[in-house]
């Protein structure tokens, strides 16, 4: 097998390939449009359609604004539709700032896009065109959602699950900053918050119905969830509407951005701690990843192969992932431009590439 890693950075898209996930051949930056420098600005998110292999990239140009590009040959060539695929209807009086997340349903054609400002779009043609999910945009809570420090956006989309034992094709779970977790059981026709137990220490009511600054949610293989909140790491063992439990005991801090669930073992996940909301540095200025194999009851640092010298780059919410292989690989990139990989049967990280621009998004696939 071969493995493809896609790395979205502050200055364009980079890739890397490997046969063994230990040694890598990095490449880039890639011009998405060979005629000019399109795509050489930020690449905020990347999506890989597991059914068709189509790649989607959410970009931003200082001159042309936000863009969505797609590739049907694993990144060899890229196309931008003639008309913007994500457009707010005129009556909303809103405009796209950028795409934050792409997610794929169980069929090859249905794609979701989470964007800034807080909105969810759906495509039924593989990502060529998207339609606003009106019920979430028109939710009565929306007037009280507000931007987090990075902006106001839907950054997590998890089709097909509402929590453990709650899988269905009509289910969708989303998370946003700042607003919290919302779920739909009817393909987006109606939505309800699912934040019970998640704190919002910056609000007068520290456990409100909604308004939490959830940084990331990851779905485990049984449909249950892990969440990295603005403060606190959480697990939802039952349907998320029944509540969340804190699981950060054993981690050096309760703050961070990224969390990755094991694709086959629901008790296993990765977390990447950050000192605090004021200090965006790794704890003790040392780069490390933490793993649980018991649903957060305990955590252990996995830092073999990572820098021993003082390190100051952190992992952003979209910059860690798994390739989903039978023997899964796990990957992360930092704001210092370094990217690392490991496999489930190893406790050592291998450097994929170094000294890239600020890493914003990482995606991997077995090809």
What function would you assign to each model-found segment?
Residues 1-367:
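Extracellular glycan-interacting surfaces
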């Amino acid at each position: 097998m071969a493995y493809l890693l896609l790395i979205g950075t502050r200055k364009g898209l980079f890739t890397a390939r490997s046969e063994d996930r230990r040694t890598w051949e990095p490449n880039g930056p890639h011009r998405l449009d060979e005629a000019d420098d399109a795509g050489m600005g930020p690449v905020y998110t990347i999506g890989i359609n597991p059914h068709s292999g189509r790649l989607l990239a959410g970009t931003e140009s200082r001159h042309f604004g936000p863009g969505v590009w797609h590739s049907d040959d694993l990144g060899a060539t890229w196309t931008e539709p003639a008309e913007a695929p994500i457009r707010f209807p005129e009556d909303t009086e809103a405009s796209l700032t950028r795409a934050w997340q792409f997610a794929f349903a169980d069929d090859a054609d249905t794609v979701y896009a989470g964007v800034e400002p807080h909105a969810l779009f759906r495509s039924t043609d593989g990502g060529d065109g998207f339609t606003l999910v009106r019920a979430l945009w028109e939710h009565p809570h929306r007037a009280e959602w507000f931007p987090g420090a990075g902006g106001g956006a839907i950054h997590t989309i998890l089709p097909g699950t509402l929590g453990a034992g709650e899988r269905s094709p009509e289910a969708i779970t989303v998370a946003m900053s700042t607003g919290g977790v919302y779920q739909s059981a009817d393909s987006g026709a109606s939505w309800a918050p699912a934040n019970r137990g998640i704190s919002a220490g910056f609000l007068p009511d520290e456990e409100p119905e909604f308004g939490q600054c959830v940084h990331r949610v990851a779905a485990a293989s049984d449909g249950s969830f892990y969440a990295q909140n603005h403060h606190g790491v959480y697990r939802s063992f039952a349907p998320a509407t029944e509540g969340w439990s804190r699981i950060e005991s054993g981690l050096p801090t309760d703050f961070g951005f990224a969390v990755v669930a094991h694709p086959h073992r629901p008790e296993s996940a990765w977390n990447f701690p950050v000192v605090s909301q004021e200090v965006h540095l790794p704890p003790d200025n040392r780069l490390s990843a933490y793993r649980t194999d018991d649903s957060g009851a305990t955590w252990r640092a996995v830092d073999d192969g990572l820098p021993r010298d003082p390190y100051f780059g952190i992992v952003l919410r979209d910059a860690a992932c798994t390739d989903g292989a039978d023997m899964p690989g796990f990957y992360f990139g930092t704001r210092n431009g370094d990217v690392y990989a490991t496999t489930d049967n190893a406790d050592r990280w291998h450097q994929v590439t170094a000294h890239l621009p600020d890493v914003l998004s990482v995606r991997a696939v077995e090809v």
